[in-house]
């Protein structure tokens, strides 16, 4: 019953060709595949891989469904509640995927993954987020770090040195004020979708409390109402008080924030490694004109967190409970070294999860993100995917209230702790 309730909560949350296939040539197999890459250039990459696989496997038909991110999350919950998952579907791993697995809605691919396929992944921590207790339900195809993308030209207009971006929180706030003084919107954000804003609060909690604070709260040896999480809210509202966002940012979508960056209407965006690809998908011509830089989230002086700690994640595909062997084989094909190298230099602009493909990255920003991911002493998956759905929803609600200045830092932390106390064992 608890799992069914969690699935209902998800509606609010989600803020080389292998040799596994066993079906004979005369038996036709259909693979249903859901992804969220709606930009024509990005969708074409996935379609090309599907076409290549189907050409090599005439008995396989791959039906692709492309949905916008929020619509995908809503529709996925609906089909999961009906017990009819897609054969392959986009997943960020963590608690959301684990809930599906506990409800019997995913296929355990551990037997097929074991050996060469599993050993090929360099992003071991990422792979583990697609499994639990020895079982695996999918694999990641890209994995990186959330950081601040910034417009070097706008920095120069504000008198800031684009080659030496701020490294501390105080320096960052100073840069925000300098941009405002120059008549430039400092930060792009689409808070209507809520998940972009939670990156700010989680990163502040990481910088202030480090890994220890999170693990204590998660393992119920501490609380999400403890000081580091309250202080994260205080620092966030310190930023909000500077009014660094576009007017009406609470009602703007993630797509709107992409447009702000592409049109050079805002100087910075805290976002994952997919951002440059998203900018190109928004407007390829304008995106090509951007002079972008990337910086890690600033450190908090006196904070317990390591400045190299990373909030991040990426994208992968999970396997539905009723998927045929061919679906697993196709997933293996998607994460082959050859295709990982291709994806890194495609419109999807991925950060490979397979070690032998990492040298395919030539873009300096992506190289920095790969380095940050691989060298992070503590890597934390986004809270809205790692935590159980009810707790993740509480995080999104609480952080949204902080941005709206509708809750105090203490009240926001208590909102999260209340959900954690009810859901975490």
What are these regions (language model features)?
Residues 174-178, 218-250:
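Glycine-centered hinge/linker elements that transmit conformational signals in sensory
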Residues 51, 55-56, 82, 158, ...:
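Extracytoplasmic/periplasmic substrate-recognition and gating elements
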Residues 5, 20-103, 115-118, 162, ...:
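Conserved N-terminal structural module of periplasmic/extracytoplasmic solute-binding proteins
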Residues 86-87, 117-155, 185-186, 304-310, ...:
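A structural signal for short loop-to-beta-strand junctions that line the ligand-binding cleft
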Residues 30, 61, 156-157, 162, ...:
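Conserved C-terminal helix/tail region of periplasmic/extracytoplasmic solute-binding proteins
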Residues 92-150, 173-174, 200, 228, ...:
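Hinge/lid segment of periplasmic solute-binding proteins
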Residues 107-124, 165, 191, 208-231, ...:
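Short, solvent-exposed loop/beta-turn-alpha elements that line the ligand-binding surface or hinge
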Residues 133, 137-141, 146, 171-221, ...:
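Extracytoplasmic/periplasmic solute-binding protein
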């Amino acid at each position: 019953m608890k799992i069914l309730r969690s699935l209902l909560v998800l509606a609010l949350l989600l803020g080389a060709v292998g040799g596994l296939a066993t079906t004979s040539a005369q038996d036709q197999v259909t693979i249903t595949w859901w992804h969220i890459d709606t930009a024509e250039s990005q969708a074409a990459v996935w379609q090309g891989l599907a076409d290549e696989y189907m050409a090599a496997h005439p008995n396989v038909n791959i039906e692709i469904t492309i949905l916008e991110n929020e619509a995908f999350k809503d529709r996925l919950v609906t089909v999961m509640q009906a017990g009819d998952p897609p054969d392959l579907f986009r997943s960020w791993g963590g608690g959301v995927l684990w809930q599906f697995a506990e409800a019997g809605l995913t296929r355990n691919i551990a037997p097929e993954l074991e050996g060469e396929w599993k050993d090929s992944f360099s992003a071991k921590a990422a792979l583990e987020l697609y499994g639990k207790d020895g079982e695996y339900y999918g694999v990641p195809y890209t994995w990186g770090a959330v950081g601040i993308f910034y417009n070097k030209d706008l920095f120069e207009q504000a008198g800031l040195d684009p080659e030496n971006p701020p490294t501390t929180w105080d320096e960052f706030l100073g840069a925000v004020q300098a941009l405002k003084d120059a008549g430039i919107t400092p930060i792009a954000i689409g808070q209507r979708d809520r998940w972009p804003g939670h990156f700010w609060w989680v990163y502040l909690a990481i910088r202030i409390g480090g890994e220890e604070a999170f693990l204590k709260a998660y393992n119920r040896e501490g609380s999400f109402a403890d000081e580091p999480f309250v202080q994260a809210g205080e620092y966030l509202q310190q930023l909000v008080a500077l009014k660094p966002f576009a007017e009406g940012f609470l009602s703007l979508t993630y797509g709107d924030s992409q447009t702000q960056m592409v049109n050079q209407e805002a100087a910075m965006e805290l976002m994952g490694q997919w951002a440059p690809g998203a900018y190109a998908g928004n407007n390829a011509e304008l995106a090509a004109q951007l002079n972008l830089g990337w910086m890690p989230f600033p450190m908090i002086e006196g904070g317990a967190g390591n400045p190299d700690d990373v909030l991040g994640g990426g994208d992968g595909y999970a396997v539905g409970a009723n998927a045929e062997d061919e679906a697993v084989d196709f997933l293996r094909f998607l994460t082959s070294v050859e295709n990982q190298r291709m994806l890194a230099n495609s419109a999807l602009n991925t950060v490979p999860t397979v070690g032998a493909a990492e040298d395919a990255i030539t873009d300096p920003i992506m190289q920095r993100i790969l380095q940050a991911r691989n060298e992070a002493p503590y890597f934390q998956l986004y809270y809205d995917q790692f935590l159980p759905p009810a707790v993740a929803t509480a995080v999104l609600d609480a952080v949204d209230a902080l941005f709206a200045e509708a809750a105090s830092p203490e009240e926001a932390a208590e909102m999260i702790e209340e959900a954690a106390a009810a859901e975490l064992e």
